[in-house]
From Swiss-Prot:
Organism: Mus musculus (Mouse)
An example Gene Ontology CC term for this record: cytoplasm
Chain's role: Cross-linked envelope protein of keratinocytes. It is a keratinocyte protein that first appears in the cell cytosol, but ultimately becomes cross-linked to membrane proteins by transglutaminase. All that results in the formation of an insoluble envelope beneath the plasma membrane.
Lineage per the UniProt record: Eukaryota, Metazoa, Chordata, Craniata, Vertebrata
UniProt-recorded name of the protein: Small proline-rich protein 2K
Biological process annotations from GO: epidermis development; keratinization; keratinocyte differentiation
Length: 68
């Protein structure tokens, strides 16, 4: 992994992309889907790490198109 990739990972991973579990489990996901705040140079994978599958399922109904 290059130095730049590591930098990107550090930038991307701590981003709070996923809403906290509690508001996420009922169909109370935040209406506006949080935009991917990662710089364009970041690899898509670390940036797109969202909720664990269990949480992501209910949340995805509110945020339909997250991958482009």
């Amino acid at each position: 992994m290059s130095y730049q990739e590591q930098q990107c990972k550090q930038l991307c991973q701590p981003l709070p992309v996923c809403p906290p579990p509690k508001p996420c489990s009922p169909p109370k996901c935040p209406e506006p889907c949080p935009p991917p705040k990662c710089p364009e140079t970041c690899p898509p994978q670390p940036c797109q790490r969202k909720c664990p599958p269990v949480l992501e399922a209910p949340c995805q109904q509110k945020c339909p198109s997250k991958s482009k």
